[in-house]
Regions:
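Structured, hydrophobic secondary-structure cores that serve as assembly/anchoring elements
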Residues: 101, 105-128, 132-267
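Extracellular Cys-Trp
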Residues: 1-118
């Protein structure tokens, strides 16, 4: 069939659906890894649509919305021969076949914790690398599985983002922090009226994100709060009276608390 046509239709469909994570277990065989990378980048950068994809061997990904899964997984399957003996067959899951499982880990991991070292108990082994090779791979934005002596686990939960800029720093390399940032973007920014309650919700989410950065040693401290000076300047620039707690006043007559509570319109 027309694989390109199917992919185009799929991308068009998902542009109007709500989801966070995507995996396509035939994407490498179909020769469409780069197309999905470009599409995810476009959705994130141009449409503020914070989707993410787990893709196999997406070495040119370099995007916080792309997880570059690069390990083979193995599962031992036992069949009964009927003569008191069994045959154990080792089944290999290529990187592309493993992507749905990895996407499932990210989608199912609580926002308060990282997927780093998450166990994959449904597999019996993984493509093994020595620690130096693992560190090198992780440093180039590859997500790996590793064998800890007892079970298969995820290595450090990194995104494929590697080329840092003044705007995007090392925090974009960590899947957990990207999830936090996406949640702030998706759940709050531009979605709610700028009421005091909604501002408090946004500030709580951003401060939770900052706390993760502090815990990871990425920043020493960070807090978000309502900027009273900017908010007062904005209200005055509108040139209109403001109603706060049932009272209508000119912006310059508002107390600091009233400025904080005032609705400042949409984002």
């Amino acid at each position: 069939g027309d694989v390109s046509g199917l992919y185009s239709a799929m991308m068009k469909y998902f542009e109007t659906e709500t989801f966070q994570w995507m995996a396509i277990p035939t994407v490498e065989t179909d020769g469409k890894v780069e197309d999905i990378v470009s599409w995810v980048k476009s959705q994130r950068n141009n449409n503020n649509y914070m989707i993410k994809a787990v893709l196999p061997n997406a070495d040119g990904g370099d995007c916080e919305g792309i997880i570059n899964w690069a390990s083979k997984l193995y599962r031992d399957e036992t069949s009964d021969n009927g003569d008191n003996s069994v045959t154990i067959t080792r089944k290999t899951y290529t990187a592309e076949q493993g992507t749905p499982r990895i996407a499932g880990i990210f989608a199912g991991t609580d926002v308060t914790i990282s997927a780093t070292y998450a166990p994959l108990k449904d597999f019996d082994d993984v493509e093994r690398l020595d620690s130096e090779a693992r560190n090198t791979a992780v440093g180039t934005g590859k997500l790996l599985g590793f064998w800890d002596g007892e079970k298969v686990k995820l290595d450090r939960a990194v995104t494929s983002f590697v080329t840092t800029t003044g705007v995007k720093g090392d925090s974009f390399k960590k899947a957990k922090l990207v999830e936090d940032m996406d949640m702030i973007q998706d759940s709050y920014i531009g979605k709610y009226a700028n009421s005091y309650d909604n501002k408090c919700l946004l500030i709580t989410a951003i401060n939770g994100y900052f706390q993760t950065l502090v815990n990871d040693g990425i920043i020493e401290s960070g807090t978000a709060e309502i900027d009273l000076t900017s908010q007062r300047t904005y209200l005055e620039s509108l040139g209109k009276s403001v109603t706060v707690n049932g009272e209508t006043k000119k912006p310059e007559d508002l107390s600091d608390d009233e400025v904080k509570i005032a609705n400042t319109g949409s984002h």
